[in-house]
UniProtKB/Swiss-Prot annotation:
GO terms for molecular function: magnesium ion binding; terpene synthase activity. Monomer. The allele found in cv. B73 encodes an inactive enzyme while the two alleles found in cv. Delprim encode an active (TPS5A) and an inactive (TPS5B) enzyme. Non-functional sesquiterpene synthase having less than 1% of the activity found in cv. Delprim. The lineage of its organism: Eukaryota, Viridiplantae, Streptophyta, Embryophyta, Tracheophyta. GO terms for cellular component: cytoplasm. GO terms for biological process: diterpenoid biosynthetic process. This is Inactive sesquithujene synthase. The Asp-Asp-Xaa-Xaa-Asp/Glu (DDXXD/E) motif is important for the catalytic activity, presumably through binding to Mg(2+). Its cofactor is Mg(2+); Mn(2+). It comes from Zea mays (Maize). Mg(2+) 3 binds at N452, S456, E460. Keywords: Cytoplasm, Magnesium, Manganese, Metal-binding.
Length: 554
């Protein structure tokens, strides 16, 4: 999933094992999660029993909500979703969303309500018009909002980031409110809850934040709000702590799998980032029923990391081509094609895919066939990039993205997530749609590729790497690397607009399909914005501690 592979001499003997790379720092976590000990069964049972009582109490509150009290209803739904509780109330929330969308009888002069309603509906797949904000524009080009009405200002800023191309009113809302919020932040107490909200939004608008991480960060802020619902607050804390127990057990399982993979395959040159990869994938599939998706995703990401490091830095051209030939056979008899150092890994990879089939059972094991197809396509594209490299070919930006938007692993990741979902709405048609690499997933792949390349290119330019999208853009337009990176950041911003437009146009697919792609985009943005946190993972340490180490005090 990094940039196309560096050139390696083809004269190395097949039996030579690549040496460990000094480029990548060792794991920051060691055996930490391998030694995890869960609470006793009675303790966990008590937590689950209390959570169930609270869930039903909150359900009654939600069922009692109507559009007659629109501000309260909108705020309640936003709060539940932001606290990571929306999954439990999908039916009730869907019913209310339809009523909110259909009911135009509300105070259109209330900027906070208009902003929150717009944000809520667009976030949940309703294509509401942005012209509701036109009445708030001033002759000076700003937006009418009293200086003391800071909450409305923040709501408008966050709502505007659910924008589509050509929505000038939202462009103007972002530029206008950003300046006012930056000024406001300088006058707030730094540790106040509202200052933290403003600061977080200026760094990452609410729509783009990783859901489970946002829940962890928002719970202590919600606790300070005078209008908080005590049952909602207690449930949010308990729910997060229960999820954390599941996450730690999954991390223990994935860490053991990874350690066995590296020990038996003897591939010591690969990046040891299984904890960070689990954190990354967790951000896309954090709801309680998606445990198997998280495990499959993490293992697939681990396998891709190994294959990528083989192709990217350590394998000869001949070795990589042999691996590609064996890969598509999915059979132990193909190991005779491989150099010695790849053979054990190949067998372990086959065993891993068999474990996926076993975990899915007879009714859903067919999903692994689609996952294999996605992985075959990934390796096929890796070989195309090798040919470009060996021929010293620099593609145009458009030509590069036709390959690299897919070779970044977009299809492999989405198919991995869908494979592990218990939801029976995920069908063969869902996988066939995904494997056709439709424009929505292609846009997501371009987003991941560009985000990766902007942060990895400067690090990789000192090595013998094939041109990234940054280099392609530099050559095509005759500009510097810094200027190319700035332009690509604009393209990344456009990708958010593209994905929103394309998601709103999707028909006939389970709603989890676009939701998953957006969650992948959020967690990828968190990994690559301003740094390559997978390679230099110190940047993730505090976030990993928050999600997997530190429970929320009850």
């Amino acid at each position: 999933m990094a940039s196309p592979p560096a050139h390696r001499s083809s004269k190395a003997a097949d039996e030579e094992l690549p040496k460990a790379s000094s480029t990548f720092h060792p794991s920051l976590w060691g055996s930490f999660f391998l030694t995890y000990q869960p609470p006793t069964a009675p303790q966990r049972a008590n937590m689950k029993e209390r959570a169930e009582v609270l869930r039903e109490r909150v359900r009654k509150v939600l069922k009692g909500s109507t559009t007659d009290q629109l501000p309260e209803t909108v705020n309640l739904i936003l709060t539940l979703q932001r606290l990571g509780l929306g999954y439990y109330y999908e039916n009730e929330i869907d019913k209310l969303l339809h009523q909110i969308y259909s009911n135009s009888d509300y105070n259109v002069k209330d900027l906070n309500l208009v902003s929150q309603r717009f944000y809520l509906l667009r976030k949940n797949g309703y294509d509401v018009p942005s012209d509701v904000f036109l009445s708030f524009k001033t002759e000076e080009g700003g937006f009418a909002c009293a200086a003391a009405d800071t909450r409305s200002l923040l709501s408008l800023y966050n709502a505007a980031y659910l924008w589509k191309h050509g929505e000038e009113v939202l462009d103007e809302a972002i530029s206008s409110t950003r300046l006012r919020l930056q000024d406001l932040l300088g006058r707030l107490l730094p540790e106040s809850p509202f200052a933290k909200e403003v600061s977080s939004s200026l760094r990452t608008p609410l729509f783009r934040r990783v859901g489970i991480l946002e829940a962890r960060n928002y719970i202590p802020i919600y606790e300070t709000e005078a209008t908080r619902n005590e049952a909602v607050l207690e449930l949010a804390k308990l729910n997060f702590n229960l999820q954390q127990l599941d996450f730690c057990e999954e991390l223990k399982h994935c860490s053991a799998w990874w350690n066995e993979m590296i020990a038996k395959s003897k591939l010591t040159f690969v990046r040891d980032r299984i904890v960070e990869e689990y954190f990354w994938m967790n951000g896309a599939c954090y709801d309680p029923p998606y445990s198997l998706s998280r495990i499959i995703l993490t293992k697939i990401t681990g396998l891709i990391t190994i294959i990528d490091d083989m192709f990217d830095t350590h394998g000869t051209t001949e070795d990589c081509m042999k691996f590609a030939e064996a890969f598509g056979r999915w059979d132990e008899s193909a190991i005779h094609l491989l150099p010695e150092y790849m053979k054990d890994f190949y067998i372990l990879m086959l065993e891993t895919f068999q474990s996926f089939e076993d975990a899915l059972g007879p009714e859903k094991s067919y999903r692994v066939l689609y996952l294999k197809q996605a992985m075959e396509r990934l390796v096929e594209l890796y070989t195309k990039e090798i040919k470009w490299r060996d021929e010293d070919y620099v593609a145009t930006m458009s030509e590069h993205l036709k390959v690299s938007a897919e070779s970044i692993g977009a299809n492999a990741l989405t198919c991995s997530a869908y494979a592990g979902m218990g939801d029976m709405s995920i069908t063969k048609e869902t996988f066939e749609w995904a494997l056709s690499f439709p424009q929505f997933i292609r846009t997501f792949g371009s987003f991941v590729r560009l985000s990766n390349d902007v942060e990895s290119t400067k690090r990789e330019q000192t090595k013998d790497h094939s041109p990234s999208t940054v280099h392609c853009y530099m050559k095509e337009h005759g500009i510097t690397m810094d200027d190319a990176c700035e332009k690509i950041k604009e393209l990344i911003e456009d990708s958010w607009k593209d994905m929103l437009e394309q998601s709103l146009a999707l028909k006939g697919l389970p709603k989890v399909v676009p939701q998953l792609v957006f969650d992948f985009s959020r967690t990828t943005d968190n990994m690559y914005r301003d740094r390559d946190a997978l390679t230099s993972s110190e940047a993730l340490k505090e976030m990993i501690q928050l999600l997997f180490v530190e429970p929320i005090p009850e």
